[in-house]
Amino acid sequence: YSRSNSAESNILTEKYIKKIAGFFIKKNMKIKLFINTIGFLHDDKHLPEKKFQDINFEYMKKSFEINTIPTALMIKYFSPLMAKDEKSIFATISAKVGSISDNFLGGWYSYRASKAALNQIIKTASIEQKRINNKLIIVSVHPGTVSSKLSKPFIGKKEVQTPEESAKKIIIL
């Protein structure tokens, strides 16, 4: 399909993810590029935890409900719709802090854990999908530090890129 299409959905429910996939099925569309940009780090009530005692059940649950579970469901419903006769890509935005081996600072328990779980889902799904559609690449991408509402409270003096700059770098991959 040569033109981009967007469909609004409530990303937190399986019902709506399935409904959006149904939109593509009805149009008999095969997807060549799927980019999932869903992400959550903080809200008005909670900032990332600095120590273990700061862990809050609702905040941690929300982190997984937004950062992890919808992507698993998107893979479930959209991977069968990905093109099989040519290379297709299912990419999801993740975060370097989701790397277990790259954790040198600690803290941010809910965000780190939800992104680590996301990365594991991506890795496991990519292995499974190779057996089903060897033209499909399932990958997670760290976009770098991007100037956004998500990162604004934590940027400090770090080098920051605009969303457009980050998107250009991701597309090059």
Feature locations, PLM:
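Rossmann-fold cofactor-recognition segment
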Residues: 2-19
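A glycine-rich helix->loop->beta "capping" turn
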Residues: 23-38
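Hydrophobic structural elements of the Rossmann-like NAD(P)H-binding subdomain
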Residues: 35, 91, 138-141, 151
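Conserved Rossmann-fold SDR core element
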Residues: 129-146
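C-terminal helical subdomain
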Residues: 140, 148, 153-173
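Catalytic loop of short-chain dehydrogenase/reductase
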Residues: 40-44, 48-64, 86-132
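Conserved active-site helix of classical SDR/Rossmann-fold NAD(P)-dependent CH-OH oxidoreductases
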Residues: 72, 116-127, 164-172
